[in-house]
């Protein structure tokens, strides 16, 4: 079995029964179930949702996205071995810990396979809920260029790279391109202030203005739970991105929940504590891969400048990355997942065949 066989690169061509187009994102694909199948599964599996709640199958891939591009490696390697299973395992672990600590629910109802979630359809809040405990990444780059105002927050002078901030900073951005909002540019992932959100809460899909404080509370609480757990395994939770949405429970009550993934190496920066104390940064997240790309290509501005997207897409399409870099990233994902969950990630020989088998035999979702 070759490495490329073990990688699930294409995840939007599964024969899952659906009557809607498959939504294919950078990493995950979503198959909306028919109304009949949704009702049947809710009844058969006893999911705690309304009887008519729309359900979906969410399938993660092993594709690697960075700087808004999908990258590939030598030997026709179209993804990172173990990445999808590692990300799902980490999210599953944190969502369970959130539940144990009395935080909000997630959109996940069932986990048929390490690559698969059965989820309840949610109305997404159109915000990338980002928070930062250290100054690094894009915030540091902006700071070195003289910027001191960040999402309406004024940063103090004389901060140093990778320094711990005095408090957890909430630095939200838009989820996608939002149009017709005063003071918010119509570009992807643009930073916004709390006042932007307050003045336009309905356009960000909040049901009421009070829910802004609720999302902030859930963001801070979720960050604290993960940071505490990571501290126990000598890891630092540097910064992260959460996403939120609304669902209805079995009684028809609307509630704000966590959705997408949480606390993963894709959505967060995680540093090794011992290395940080000795003045070094060891990345246990995708950030190490981003740094590799910036050093690998002679003109890193292509990866950072949003006005050069066509060049960037060509760079990703035309360049097979060294196998060593792909496998180093695989080890990062597998190692941090094992540390967080306490169990090793088992690589599948043929994930696509396994997914089809379980959805056909145990869920009757494949004809």
Curated annotation (Swiss-Prot):
Protein name: Phosphoribosylaminoimidazole-succinocarboxamide synthase
Annotated family: Belongs to the SAICAR synthetase family.
Organism lineage string: Bacteria, Pseudomonadati, Pseudomonadota, Gammaproteobacteria, Vibrionales
Keywords assigned: ATP-binding, Ligase, Nucleotide-binding, Purine biosynthesis
One Pfam family from the record: SAICAR_synt
Pathway: Purine metabolism; IMP biosynthesis via de novo pathway; 5-amino-1-(5-phospho-D-ribosyl)imidazole-4-carboxamide from 5-amino-1-(5-phospho-D-ribosyl)imidazole-4-carboxylate: step 1/2
UniProt-recorded Gene Ontology molecular function terms: ATP binding; phosphoribosylaminoimidazolesuccinocarboxamide synthase activity
Assigned GO CC terms: cytoplasm
PANTHER family reported for this sequence: PHOSPHORIBOSYLAMINOIMIDAZOLE-SUCCINOCARBOXAMIDE SYNTHASE
One of the GO biological process terms: 'de novo' IMP biosynthetic process
Domain of life: Bacteria
Catalytic reaction equation(s): 5-amino-1-(5-phospho-D-ribosyl)imidazole-4-carboxylate + L-aspartate + ATP = (2S)-2-[5-amino-1-(5-phospho-beta-D-ribosyl)imidazole-4-carboxamido]succinate + ADP + phosphate + 2 H(+)
EC number: 6.3.2.6
């Amino acid at each position: 079995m070759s490495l490329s066989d073990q990688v699930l690169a294409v995840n939007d061509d599964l024969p899952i029964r659906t009557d809607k187009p498959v939504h294919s994102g950078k990493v995950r694909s979503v198959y909306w179930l028919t109304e009949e199948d949704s009702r049947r599964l809710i009844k058969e599996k006893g999911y705690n949702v309304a009887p008519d709640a729309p359900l979906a199958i969410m399938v993660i891939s092993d594709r690697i996205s960075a700087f808004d591009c999908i990258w590939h490696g030598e030997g026709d390697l179209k993804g990172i071995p173990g990445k999808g299973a590692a990300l799902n395992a980490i999210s599953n672990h944190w969502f369970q810990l959130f539940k144990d600590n009395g935080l909000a629910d997630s959109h996940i109802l069932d986990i048929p396979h390490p690559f698969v979630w059965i989820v309840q359809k949610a109305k997404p809040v159109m915000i990338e809920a980002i928070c930062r405990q250290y100054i690094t990444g894009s915030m540091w780059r902006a700071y070195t260029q003289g910027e001191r105002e960040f999402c309406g927050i004024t940063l103090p002078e004389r901060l140093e790279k990778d320094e711990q901030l005095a408090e957890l900073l909430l630095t939200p951005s838009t989820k996608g391109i939002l149009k017709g909002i005063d003071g918010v540019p119509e570009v992807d992932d643009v930073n916004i202030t709390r006042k932007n959100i307050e003045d336009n809460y309905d356009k960000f899909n909040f049901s009421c203005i009070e829910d802004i404080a609720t999302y902030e509370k859930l963001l801070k609480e979720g960050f604290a739970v993960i940071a505490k757990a990571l501290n126990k395994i000598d890891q630092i939770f540097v910064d992260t991105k959460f996403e939120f949405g609304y669902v209805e429970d079995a009684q028809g009550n609307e509630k704000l929940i966590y959705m997408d993934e949480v606390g993963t190496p894709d959505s967060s920066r995680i540093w090794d504590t011992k290395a940080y104390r000795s003045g070094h940064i060891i990345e246990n997240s995708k950030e190490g891969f981003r740094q590799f790309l910036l050093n690998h290509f002679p003109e890193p501005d292509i990866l950072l400048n949003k006005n050069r997207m066509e060049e960037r897409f060509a760079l990703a399409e035309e360049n097979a990355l060294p196998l060593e870099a792909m496998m180093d990233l695989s080890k990062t994902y597998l190692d941090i997942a094992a540390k967080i969950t306490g169990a090793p990630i088992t690589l599948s020989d043929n994930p696509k065949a396994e997914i089809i088998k379980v959805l056909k035999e145990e869920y009757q979702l494949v004809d």
